[in-house]
Amino acid sequence: MKLLYTVISLIFLFTYPAWAQQHEIFNQRIRTLQVVGGTNWLSLPVSSLGGEPIHIDFDDMTHDYHRYSYKIEHCDANWNVSSSLFESDYMRGFNGNQIIEDVKQSINTNHPYTHYHLAIPNADCQLTMSGNYRLTVYDDNAENEEEGKMFTACWMITEPQPLVKLKIEATSTTDIDIQKDHQQLKMELDHSQLRITHPNQLNIVVLQNGRWDNAVINPKPDYLSAGKMNWQHVRALIFDAGNEYRKFEFLDTDHPTMGIDAIDWDGSDYQVKVMTDSPRPNYVYDEAAKGSFYIRNSDNVENNNTCEYAQIHFTLKAPKLPGDVYLNADWTYGRFLPEYRMEYDEMTKTYHARLFMKQGYYSYQYLMKMEDGSIRLLPSEGNFYQTQNKYNVLVYYRAQSDRTDRLVGYGELK
């Protein structure tokens, strides 16, 4: 028992440089990339071996057909490619030369585009190992592989049956304050089915609302017993409660819908103004989707290739802040890029951003990036213990005979 305690304690002394399950777009022709496990667009892109497929959807902003091929790579818990594996270790079928064949051109849209859809598994490839996966899409008509690299998409696959039991609880009675600005996670992990003999065999990731910028990696448990770990008063598992995500729904080009102030046509584009976001001194319950988005229009028929693209204008009323203000959501892919950064107007005391987006439902929040790279909540957005945050826990395991990490446990608390 003493040896087990020592080994497991050492696990939580390790740190990792770049935890990131983040999609990345390399070519500006690609828009509205979405990765969904089954039909659950409100959660992380997670499925199980033999379970529902992973769906990958995106638009190419031309009406030209492009021969897009894809390559799938297995990654370890730290999202590094599992270089010790052969492709046959984690998949059956073909990899690297298969073409995305589900293609539809847009119909009667101001901006023509072509929609592509891919489901994994499919007739050409089936995954056989749990863990992290990264798919890269290439344009086969490009002169070279680097020029043809269009985007990467990431998802997670769990074991068919969980190899660990996970209990998660969130409380507003924290070790920092009581029913004020924070939420604290309490967890219990039963790993009695696993044989743990080395500190690198187990990795645990805790996410708030699917965000990787404030992910907690390998929090040290404060209680250990035979086959179990408990986190009851762990400072690393205390999160800022924040506030509910904001949201809008752009469904029609003729009249405003939820959260839309005005829609204008300037001769080339629809200009859609989202209602100005004002400071929120009090908590108001709102069942927003924690950064998720769903593509549809008022007709709700063939949404993928009938929805319009428009210029969406965001306005945030707030004093000038010491850091850069960014829009943040699943549809920004967790990235703090120039296109998501808001500009400040000294005359109106407001922040502004304009993005080219497709019709649909969108939820979002504002975050502030400081000069040192740290990410903070905006003071004007409020910080309330009642906020309905979502927490995800990923448990990775590498047996002594394994050459990479498997995803043996997954939990979600809403």
Residue ranges and their predicted role:
Residues 77-79, 125-126, 139-150, 211-212, ...:
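Short acidic/polar inter-strand loop motif in beta-rich domains
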Residues 91-116, 212-224, 311-359, 371-401:
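Aromatic-rich carbohydrate-binding modules that target alpha-glucans
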Residues 197-283:
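Long, internal scaffold/assembly segments composed of regular secondary structure
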